[in-house]
Amino acid sequence: MKPVFLLLATLLLGPTAALRAADGPARKPNIILILTDDQGYGDLGRHGHPLLKTPHLDALHDQSVRFEQFYVSPSCSPTRAALLTGMHEFRNGVTHTTQPREHLNKEAILLPQLLLSAGYRTGFIGKWHLGGEGDHAPEKRGFEWCSTNVGGPNVHFDPVMVRNRKREPRKGYREDIFFDEAMAFIDEPKDAPFFCYLATYSPHAPLAAPEEFMAPFRGKVDAEEAAYLGMVANLDHNLGRLMRHLRERKLEDNTILVFMNDNGQTHGLDVFNAGMRGSKCTIWQGGSRALSFWKWAGKWSPHTVPNLTAHLDVLPTLCDLAGAPLPPPLGPKLEGFTLRPLLESATPIKWNDDRLLFHHVGRWPSGLGAAHKYAMASVQTGDLLLVRSRPCDDPACKQYSSQCTTLRSVEAGATAATYTKADAQFHWGVTPPGRWSLFDLKKDPACRNDLATERSELTAKLAASYDQWWDSLYPAMIRLGGDQGEPEPLSKGRAKKQK
């Protein structure tokens, strides 16, 4: 164990427990956290996809505790920041997917640091996207083993891999190699439980997969959609390889396997979106409702959980299950809750029924954060969604490329927009100016019937909670760089491209 984390263990656990952490505790559960990139909630057979066949994802679904109302942030880096800190991403300065606003606060305590201090060996494979240089890099944030590829999402085949700072050319498809790396990390002969964070690039653009995975979709959808679906099919194949690997090594019964995605639907939006409105980078359900399958074969019976849950809950849950205490300064800052009661109860239970979950798309032009307080924001409680899907009102924003650019074009009547060729009015739907809209997700999952006028008192109450939330985090967000950088001029013509 590295000295800095042995010190952290001493602070968290006391000297005796810290020594035990250094030696490695017996029979703590192994943990594998798989995070896919841009996969939609509907992108598997069990959720009704008309074209995708995903036998391994379907099997995991059937064997898992399934959180059917689990939410992430509407885009990539923000979700990763919230996932690893248990706090809304804005509180740690992450408001975009571009530098410097993707950089996660260097002072934040991350999940791998807590697990390392509790005796786990920690491995990261794949996409980081929280600042890859200097003290932002994963090897400086609690990961002992780090493996990724040179060129990120742009190199699909025969990548140069970097494992623990050593470069090695590899043959094959990038995601196959990522799963190979995860299995190599799992197989390291060390007497300690492991935490493996496997973050894929698939099915994020640019889109490409081995032909055998794209072939079933050719002629049924266009080439872009066939490549996207092929990437998901390849992920399913690799999930099957990993699950078989755990069985063969007799690790299945003592390994917690968590599978989730980082944001909503992208290039498969026009094919299937599970009846939801919205895509990645929108504030609608389709932008943030996520897969969340939790399997511990030796402990939990498969069941479906209807409670409102989120990426914020991953850190407190895994620390609880791993016996990793939270340092006193961190506990009050956490916005997530342990899911353990929901994982262990096969019947529905009351659990944080008054929870308020706040979302904001972020991604505004740098320097214009204050003007975007009410642009693309939402509050969710139970089955109710309070939402504003509007461009900001600041004239300065119009000269830059942002989500506001797309919303202005949709408000002007455009039918095509990012990720959709003909249904922008629905998926990028613009709400009325100057007010919030309210929807009952249970009765109206597509969010077509606005209840704000009918339920005006509740609307006002939720709107006030949003104001309080934004005002509480805004100073820290600004201090930690959430509004820094140079805005992207609209003349670059990248309004329809998303990272």
Residue ranges: model-predicted function:
Residues 473-474:
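Non-catalytic accessory segments flanking enzyme active sites
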